[in-house]
Amino acid sequence: MLTITRELRDRIVAHARADHPDEACGVVAGPAGTGRPERFVPMLNAARSPTFYEFDSGDLLKLYREMDDLDEEPVVIYHSHTATEAYPSRTDVSYASEPFAHYVLVSTAEGTDEADPYQFRSFRIVDGVITEEDVQVVEAYTA
């Protein structure tokens, strides 16, 4: 299960909406070994595409160096789908290289439920196997 604060969830969704019609992407880093997403890091979609995302290799290298210096790891790796449901594509699965990360997808496609105008879903992707997991949104983390 992914436990994430409402603030972080809202920031991910806001990034997805702001970059629409292109796919948005980013990382939420957290202290190594805790599984707790804390530091929101929106990234530039180097592909600038409505159907594909790609982290800029220089930005990604910089982020991994920062995380290493801060004893962090990528807890959430997120991106948006602009015209389809929030479910990993074959390309998404092929790029999923962090077996302990939560892969979050947000759909900004039209026609979603009015009560919940976007889909926010989390998956584990290990060795090409996709497993959807529950998302628990909290106001703050407990100790």
Model-derived features: where do they sit?
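Conserved beta-strand-loop surface patch within small alpha/beta domains used
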Residues: M1-P74, A83-A143
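Conserved, mostly hydrophobic/aromatic
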Residues: I77
